[in-house]
Curated annotation (Swiss-Prot):
Signal peptide: none annotated. It comes from Streptococcus sanguinis (strain SK36). The lineage of its organism: Bacteria, Bacillati, Bacillota, Bacilli, Lactobacillales. Keywords: Chaperone, Cytoplasm. This is Co-chaperonin GroES. The gene is groES. PANTHER family: 10 KDA HEAT SHOCK PROTEIN, CO-CHAPERONIN GROES. Pfam families: Cpn10 (PF00166). SMART domains: Cpn10.
Length: 93
């Protein structure tokens, strides 16, 4: 499993399928955001005086992330998205 460093977060993006006339269209290239589940989080970032500030998200959170943010990485057969916490727009409740 991937263990992110600093303020980075590993996400599993939810693929949404659209059907048009019985055909499945994978993904939505026009969307500005996508929904993902937080799989792993880094330890946080250090302030100038050395204090560790934890991230605002935790494993299992469902989040809204910018569509073109981060780097896609593979761990075995699974594909994940590695993003900075700043690219996460909101926690979906």
């Amino acid at each position: 499993m991937l263990k992110p460093l600093g303020d980075r977060v590993v996400l599993k993006v939810e693929e949404k399928e659209q059907k048009v006339g019985g055909f499945v269209i994978a993904g939505n290239g026009q969307a500005a955001t996508k929904t993902a589940e937080v799989v792993a989080v880094g330890q946080g970032i250090r302030t100038l005086n050395g204090e560790l500030v934890a991230l605002s998200v935790k494993e299992g959170d469902k989040v809204l992330v910018e569509n073109h943010a981060g780097v896609e990485v593979k761990d075995g057969e699974e594909a994940y998205l590695l993003v900075s916490e700043a690219n996460i727009l909101a926690v979906v409740e």
